[in-house]
Every structure is written in C-alpha cells, then in structure tokens.
UniProtKB/Swiss-Prot annotation:
Belongs to the IL-10 family. This is Interleukin-24. It comes from Mus musculus. Residues 1-26 form the signal peptide. Disruption phenotype: IL24-deficient mice are more sensitive to CCL4-induced liver injury than WT counterparts.
Amino acid sequence: MSWGLQILPCLSLILLLWNQVPGLEGQEFRSGSCQVTGVVLPELWEAFWTVKNTVQTQDDITSIRLLKPQVLRNVSGAESCYLAHSLLKFYLNTVFKNYHSKIAKFKVLRSFSTLANNFIVIMSQLQPSKDNSMLPISESAHQRFLLFRRAFKQLDTEVALVKAFGEVDILLTWMQKFYHL
C-alpha cells in the first residue's frame, strides 16, 4: 500500500474529529434528498487556491475546458446528486490519486489533504437514490459525466491531470451556487 493511501484514513479521522469541535462546524447544503454537512467552505477554497497557485503554472493549454458548460448547465436538483457524486469520485480516484506525488514535491501536502478530505466527506454523504423511477435522471447525469471524462481522456495523462485540478474551482463554484452555500 502506498504512503498516500495509508495517510488518507488518518487524515479523514482528523477531519471528522476537527469538525466536531464547537464553533468549527461546517456548512450544510442540500438539494432534494441530497444533503451534506461538515464542509468548511472558506477553508476548502483556501486549500484549493494554495495548491492551484502552485500547480496552475503547468497548465499550458488554456483553450480546452474539461468541465464544459454543457456538463454543469441546467442540472436538476435530483440530477445534481448523481453528477456531483460521479465527479467527486472521479477527482478522488483519478486526479487526486495520481497527483499526490507532484503535490509532495511542491510542499503543499496539507492543503491538498484538506481538499481531498473534504471531497471524501462530501462524496460519502451524497447518496444518489437507487430507486428505478430515478433511472432517467441518473442516466442524464451519467451522460453529463461522460462528456467530462471523454474530454479528460482525449488529453495526455499529465496534461489532463493538471487541467482537471485547475478546474476544481469550476466544480466548487457550481456546487456552491447550486446548493446555495
């Protein structure tokens, strides 16, 4: 097991305990049956900007966007739960997992861990419905996610990782507006 995967459970525990301290509770957002608590949005943004300001200089392709407007525009409340869950899972399993070694070199591991841990908290709380009546909604969200993933896979892996990480602000802004944070 790699060092990065060994540290994630410890960091998750720290985040969980930290969120239990009075006065440090995170914000709550909900949409339909989706609800997330324990997210400290200002700290999430601060962590993102710390990492982005370090790695964004590597993004040489400014004409390509992975989180295109058609991925995030006109998303229904029910659909948002599925889409946010899929995007966060992709970021954790693909982008953050493969970006960890670069982050260690830049010495912004603490901010990176804050960002990853908050994504874990949000994703673990988003529980899209498995009800068959929701199938058309989940399929629509899946199609939106596939647009994002296809754009990611069309790029060289390293370029795609930098690009995806640089677009975390687009994802956070969408979630913030969508859930009225």
